[in-house]
């Protein structure tokens, strides 16, 4: 039996021989790769730290550069600005302008001063707005206010808040006088005209010029003006020009009182002129005064 068994051929296969050899052969490359990976990781970490340090240094240098540039700009601005702010006589200004090439700077400075002055003048003109109320008849639709000045109408329109139209006037002396006027009836009372003045006249009232000229002519002829009317009309008949212009006699000897021309306010004169022109008794009183004066003059000459 033992002999028979020993004579048989062993046909079994050892399947584990090759695998064991492959494992033994693969062990050395795996460890080498792990070591290489660790080395590369360490190097990468080191490079990352170096890059972070470089970025920090770059930011610090950039910040320092910006601060230096700002300081340089401020220093240059301080060096250039004092000649502009300094106020010196005309010769020093001319010299500084010549040194800096300041012809353009001088002209620009003058232009800036002119613009500032113009803006201030425009602001002052805009602030001078006045409003005056005039009593008229409701049937009057002309929207004309007799305030002593001459006006030119250049427009009219209807507003939303008032059924009455609004008329626009400008001074007859325009463009030398830039005063404008808006006239419209009051919403509460249609018999009241509301005149809004924008600006201030730069010339005297035409009626004042005529009255002063008439008074000068009368005084040069040696005459004296009088107003023999009732006491309640005396105050309103002291200013009219007609009485002064028509009486130029050299032989008036009756004791009369001389006309007084006080310096009244413009608003008072405008109100007085408006009330006199609309008073129906004013014409009759003026005619009576002139007739009485002419009669007195003829009686004295005889």
UniProtKB/Swiss-Prot annotation:
DNA-binding residues: 140-206
Coiled coil among keywords: no
GO biological process entries: defense response to bacterium; defense response to fungus; negative regulation of DNA-templated transcription; regulation of defense response; response to molecule of bacterial origin; response to salicylic acid; response to wounding
A GO cellular-component term linked to this record: nucleus
Subcellular location: Nucleus
Predominant location: nucleus
Entries under Gene3D superfamilies matching the protein: WRKY domain
InterPro entries listed in its UniProt record: WRKY_dom, WRKY_dom_sf, WRKY_plant
Stated name of the protein: Probable WRKY transcription factor 40
Species assigned in the record: Arabidopsis thaliana
Name of the gene: WRKY40
């Amino acid at each position: 039996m033992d002999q028979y068994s020993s004579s048989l051929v062993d046909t079994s296969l050892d399947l584990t021989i090759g695998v064991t050899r492959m494992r033994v052969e693969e062990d050395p490359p795996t460890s080498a790769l792990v070591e290489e990976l660790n080395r590369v990781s360490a190097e990468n970490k080191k490079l990352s730290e170096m890059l972070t340090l470089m970025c920090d240094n770059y930011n610090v240098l950039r910040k320092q550069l910006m601060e230096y540039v700002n300081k340089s700009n401020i220093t240059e601005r301080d060096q250039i600005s004092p000649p502009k702010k300094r106020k010196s006589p005309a010769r020093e200004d001319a010299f500084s302008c010549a040194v800096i090439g300041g012809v353009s700077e001088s002209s620009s400075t003058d232009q800036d001063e002119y613009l500032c002055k113009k803006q201030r003048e425009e602001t002052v003109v805009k602030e001078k707005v006045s409003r005056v109320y005039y009593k008229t008849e409701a049937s009057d639709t002309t929207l004309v206010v007799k305030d002593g000045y001459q006006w030119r109408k250049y427009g009219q329109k209807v507003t939303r808040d008032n059924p009455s139209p609004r008329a626009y006037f400008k001074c007859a002396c325009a463009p030398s006088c830039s005063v404008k006027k808006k006239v419209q009836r009051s919403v509460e009372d249609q018999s009241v005209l509301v005149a809004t003045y924008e600006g201030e006249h730069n010339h005297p009232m035409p009626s004042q010029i005529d009255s002063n000229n008439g008074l000068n002519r009368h005084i040069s002829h040696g005459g004296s003006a009088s107003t023999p009317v009732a006491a309640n009309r005396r105050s309103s008949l002291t200013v009219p020009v007609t009485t002064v212009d028509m009486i130029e006699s050299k032989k008036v000897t009756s004791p009369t009182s001389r006309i007084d021309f006080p310096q009244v306010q413009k608003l008072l004169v405008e109100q007085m002129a408006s009330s006199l022109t609309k008073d129906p008794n004013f014409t009759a009183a003026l005619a009576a005064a002139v007739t009485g004066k002419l009669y007195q003059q003829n009686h004295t000459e005889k």
